[in-house]
Amino acid sequence: MKRHLVAVDIGGSKTAFLARTVGSDRKASVERYKTPASGGVGAMLALLDEHIDGLAGGRSSLAALGVAVPGHVDPNGHVVCAGNLEGWVDVPLREQLEERYRVPVFVEGDANCGALGEKWLGAAKEMNDFVFLALGTGVGAGVFVNGSLHRGAHSAAGEVGDMTFPRRKRNGAAPTLASIVGKRALKKVVRRETGKKLTAAEALHRAAKDRRLERLTREFIEYLSTSVVAISSLLDPEAILFGGGTSKAGEALLKRVRETVAPNHVVRARLMLAGLGSEAQLYGALWGAQNALASSQALDAVEQLPQAAP
């Protein structure tokens, strides 16, 4: 029976699944489902069950699982918090999944997964210092320094969505980067002002030829560009890779960010689209599942070695 590696990218609005046969390097198809709006972790586990049970060979064919979570995850796969998911606070997710499926499990923050995916199969294969900027329902960054994923002292490196801008207070509170650059925020502004139901990526793409949309997306570009300058001045990366659903705006997005940051000479990094596009996080989770399986097999091999004589 063929055994499968399953990767899951949990987003604030959509959850993507990818299954690949162990040992294969063939590109697998991606399936997307609506992320449960309520029910917390239990609702997501039910969605996982449904997908995994639908594999050829069913649950018994699952070899390892990799999961990208939109939030703060510690090195042990414990979800500290995931702000865009109801009830996801202090969740021992890796432990729960290992008990549920009895296979090796990898759990990581989605931005970190994006960086891992790009380093493995994407635009950063030859880079040692780069930042993957995940633009979706929220905003996060996966950081590579000297060829390794940088987590920080509290495993919270890259939580750029929490950056605040005190000089632009709204209703007495300083807005965060995520509150402006998150795709729901831009979608809401566009719909309120134009009546059009456009995704953030669509609005940014059309803004190149639509003055009204250009004006409505200007604040988005300004805030995003400010974060690019901050990241560049702090880390001096070789490149900043734009991924996540909003990156589907493509060169229309990059062109405006480049033009906005151009006067600031601290930005030496190349501003690029992620090589794997909006699937970078999914492939990072797949890398994690593959690595978890290999580590488990190596441990099993060691445990099966004959014991040395006393």
Per-range role (PLM):
Residues 152-153:
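A short alpha->loop->secondary-structure connector
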Residues 9, 66-70, 132-138, 142-144:
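Short beta-strand segments
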Residues 105-109:
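General beta-strand structural signal in soluble alpha/beta enzymes
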Residues 13-14, 111, 137-140:
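Conserved A3 ("GATE") glycine/threonine-rich loop of ANL adenylate-forming enzymes
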Residues 79-89:
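A charged helix-plus-loop insertion that forms the helical arch/lid used to bind
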Residues 1-64, 74-76, 95-103, 117-127, ...:
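ATP-binding/phosphotransfer module of carbohydrate and carboxylate kinases, centering on a glycine-rich
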Residues 156-160:
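Structural signature of FAD isoalloxazine-binding scaffolds in flavoprotein oxidoreductases
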